[in-house]
């Protein structure tokens, strides 16, 4: 419904990732660790940095089937520049109407422990999504875990 509503408003969204197996998460995390090791970080440092960008196996919200990564046909790279697209702005403004929250907001990185992900949305239901988004909270704050 959210993708259809965005399209009606002239914004084309594209599902990049939804449910992800633990095996796929392990593959993505290992690749991210190797990327950081190539910059000169130790194994432990690379693992800590990688975990800010890719959830370690067994910890990804994608395992639950409640998280989605949405991009556009013209901006398929999941990077911070995505936040400047009309699609990201539309999703942030309208996601709660469909039960989703922007899961990792830019101003909550110290709380979530995850880098800003303007493409990552988590389903929590309409009531909770509206409460979270209207108050400018992240999920940890809303659940009282911070």
Where are these regions (language model features)?
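Cell-envelope/glycan interface and biosynthesis
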Residues: 1-146
């Amino acid at each position: 419904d959210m993708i259809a509503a965005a399209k009606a408003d002239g914004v084309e969204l594209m599902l990049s990732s939804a449910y992800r197996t633990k095996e796929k998460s392990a593959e993505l995390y290992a690749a991210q660790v190797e990327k950081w090791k190539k910059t000169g970080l130790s194994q432990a440092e690379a693992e800590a940095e990688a975990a800010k960008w890719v959830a370690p196996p067994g910890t990804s919200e994608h395992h639950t089937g409640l998280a989605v990564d949405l991009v556009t046909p013209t901006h398929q790279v999941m990077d911070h520049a995505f936040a400047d697209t009309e699609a990201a702005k539309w999703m942030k403004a309208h996601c709660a109407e469909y039960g989703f929250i922007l899961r990792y907001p830019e101003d909550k990185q110290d709380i979530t422990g995850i880098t800003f992900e303007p493409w990552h949305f988590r389903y929590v239901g309409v009531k909770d999504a509206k409460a979270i988004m209207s108050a400018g909270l992240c999920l940890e704050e809303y659940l009282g875990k911070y």
